[in-house]
Amino acid sequence: MVDKRSSPLGEVTPFLTQKTKLKVYKDVGNWQVIVGELHAKKRLGGELRYSIEELNPYLNREERNPYILNTALLEGREIKDDPHPTGAMNQLGKLEDGNVAELFFSIRTLRSPEEVLKLLSNYDVKATSMAVFAGELKDFKLGTYSSSGADYMIPHLTLRPKVQFGDNHSLSLWHTFFSEDTEITDHVKQLIADVEWMTDNIKYNGVDEDIKRLAYLRKNGVQVYGATVTGPVRELEKLKEEQEFWEFRLGRIEVWNWD
């Protein structure tokens, strides 16, 4: 996630190119851990271009899309594969109790965000984002994606907790996770509003695909096929009991920092 709490460091070059950079972080337990930096630039009358410089602590290990979109979801069928690959869960089982971690998982059927939060409500974990299905490979083709058998890893919209700014562009409301005190519709409305604003006001690579995503969401509503959660490692282990969750992948691990 991009840190929106601080003012970005911006500059305008002699050639009228706007440049800025922002910290990128992940929620691991109750900490926001810096994992990189976003660099964005826009030439006068040109496209907005950006790149993310990752602070990867490991050699020869690239970050990859952690969510699986199975062909069955595109065809309206239920995934019949083994829902619980053991890799991430085996790793969690070897961690000491005094740790928190970030865990990704995919979902066997398309679900509303409310349904996912209800499934998670029995566990002491926090959901920080969800992978949104917006018609990719079903209603329209994508320029780039990867696949392995019936599984697709695609660029996707991400549902995140709502962020709100005041009249002076200062941050007035900020959540790091989806709270039961806030209606999920508020977060969904922000997602739609953000995509509307971007496609109307910014030229960027992929804008045509986002216009199609927006049309799909307006017609069909928001459904998700994956989520990211964080919490104590013992609580994360319990998620393997949920039949709807599969393809678990372990993210960052930190020492205990949980309320």
Region roles according to the model:
Residues 2-20, 24:
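Terminal interaction modules at protein C-ends
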Residues 5, 48, 181-184:
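Intrinsic-disorder-associated interaction segments
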Residues 13, 17-20, 71, 86, ...:
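Residue-identity detector for threonine
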Residues 25-26, 31-168:
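Extracytoplasmic beta-rich ectodomain segments of secreted or membrane-anchored proteins
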Residues 172-259:
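Extracytoplasmic/luminal low-complexity segments enriched in Pro/Gly and acidic/polar residues
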